[in-house]
Amino acid sequence: MILLVENYDSFTYNLAQIVGEVTELKVLRNDDKSLYSIADQSDGIIFSPGPGRPDEAGELENMIRRYYDKKPLLGICLGHQAIGEVFGGTVTRAAAIRHGKVSTMITTAPSALFTAPKTNIMRYHSLIVKADQVSKDFIITGQSSDDREVMAMQHKLLPIFGLQFHPESIGTPEGAEMIRKFVTLTQDSN
């Protein structure tokens, strides 16, 4: 079972549809009282997009601190930023606001979630994890070709992934497959 932590964002329902097609799913908001008990039972956790800063999103960062070495984690947009921040990275304003903008992501290192050397991605964000301040425990696996901002990262040893872009959007043609690969990874690790 995958726990999808909902950060008050409508894109969560697109994620839920993709995940729910391949495995059991529970969706709970980031401030739900049963969050930790359901997380304890899950095979992996996905942290959804959402508004605002990661340190203002309910239990988001506390959950990452609690489960980073116990469960596979995938952070999307706000979730990606929260992972970056929890591991000592800096979240800052992007060079430009990217709401509903398609960019090309260049693969900069091998990833368990995608293999194409480049792919179109849909962006909805004004904050980023600063490239030169990503934790040394992480590898940047994808950057936008237009502004070289971090679009994907993964932990060097643990199954922890961050995607700044929206894989659940129709504007990311290979995004659903990325999400399915994460779900498969959670099933393989248990």
Language model features with spans:
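Structural signature of beta-strand start/N-cap positions in the alpha/beta core
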Residues: 1, 24, 43-44, 72-74, ...
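Active-site beta-alpha loop architecture of Rossmann-like, nucleotide-cofactor-dependent enzymes
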Residues: 11, 52-54, 170
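Cysteine-nucleophile active-site neighborhood
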Residues: 43-111, 179
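Catalytic beta-strand/loop cores that center a nucleophilic Ser/Cys/Thr
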Residues: 112-158
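A short beta-strand-loop structural module common to alpha/beta enzyme folds
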Residues: 24-32
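Short amphipathic alpha-helix with an adjacent loop that forms part of the alpha/beta core around
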Residues: 33-42, 133-136
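Acyltransferase
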Residues: 169-190
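Short, charged N-terminal beta->alpha structural module
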Residues: 2-21
